[in-house]
Amino acid sequence: MSHSDQSQRFLFDDTDVRGEMVDLERSYSEVLAKHPYPEPVAQLLGEMLAAASLLCGTLKFDGLLVLQARSSGAVPLLMVECSSDRQVRGLARYSAESIGADAGMQELMPEGVLTLTVDPVKGQRYQGIVALEGVNLAECLSNYFASSEQLPTRFWLNANGRRARGLLLQQLPADRLKDPEAREASWQHLTTLADTLTAEELLALDNETVLHRLYHEETVRLFEPQPLVFHCSCSRERSANALVSLGQADCERLLEEEEGSISIDCQFCNQRYLFDASDVAQLFAGAGSQGPSETRH
């Protein structure tokens, strides 16, 4: 069974419903390798990576999709990005001493808020906000789509610190089925079947097996899988631009406080970018941002 990181789309030929499945191993492992997350945090972060990848697969755009959850609990921040090029990255901030071994989403992130942002290269930025309610992230996202003016969409998510998996079903505008009652009956039928899939099966089975297990009596068209990879968009140039935005006076003050070298660390991948006095002088002289080579923690 192949576990290569991928998203795979499928359609039901006899009704107006499409689906997407996501499988993340290597990219999920690379995200977790950057920080020593407790197991419950790693699991929730994996579910968010799968969810963002699923959502990105339903959109036709050139840009970035961001899922961000904030709370007043042990995990004040979870943030995941997926680009239209199917590149993912993610991070979490947490207080380890207050996290139980079996803590769920509501224990980790009480009174939380989930923000979905679609930021296209061209066009208008979209943002939706919903309370982080429900037993788990899949229920929260499903409730968000049910309560907003979006296409009805359901999610099934699971992660175990090694593999993150997701299944999405989305009802499309009326085409094959025009009758509202027939559309609703078809939607309820397909989602009810998906509800019989256990979390263990979602993690253990490949896409074709999952679809056969659920929909062997339906006509399902499975498309070619699309690769997903971990990629961090940080760069020395972006770090230099951040310093320029601070202004020369603040940068010179930082140089004094940091004993002659400013370091900027990427919170996603732990890459560190160093700028000495000569680099800072070049930035504000308009001579570019080239300087010492990058080093890691």
Swiss-Prot record:
The positions making up the signal sequence are none
Gene3D superfamilies per the record? helix hairpin bin, Hsp33 domain, HSP33 redox switch-like
Going by the UniProt record, its keywords in alphabetical order are: Chaperone, Cytoplasm, Disulfide bond, Redox-active center, Stress response, Zinc
| GO molecular function ontology, one term from the record | protein folding chaperone
| Disulphide-bonded residues | 232-234, 266-269
CDD domains of this UniProt entry?
Answer: Hsp33
Give me any GO biological process, just one.
Answer: protein refolding
Modification after translation is described as: Under oxidizing conditions two disulfide bonds are formed involving the reactive cysteines. Under reducing conditions zinc is bound to the reactive cysteines and the protein is inactive.
**One GO cellular component, as annotated:** cytoplasm
The cellular location(s) given in this protein's UniProt record come to: Cytoplasm
Q: What does this protein do?
A: Redox regulated molecular chaperone. Protects both thermally unfolding and oxidatively damaged proteins from irreversible aggregation. Plays an important role in the bacterial defense system toward oxidative stress.
Family according to the record: Belongs to the HSP33 family.
Name of the protein in question: 33 kDa chaperonin
**What species is given as this protein's source?**
Pseudomonas aeruginosa (strain LESB58)
The gene from which this protein is expressed is hslO
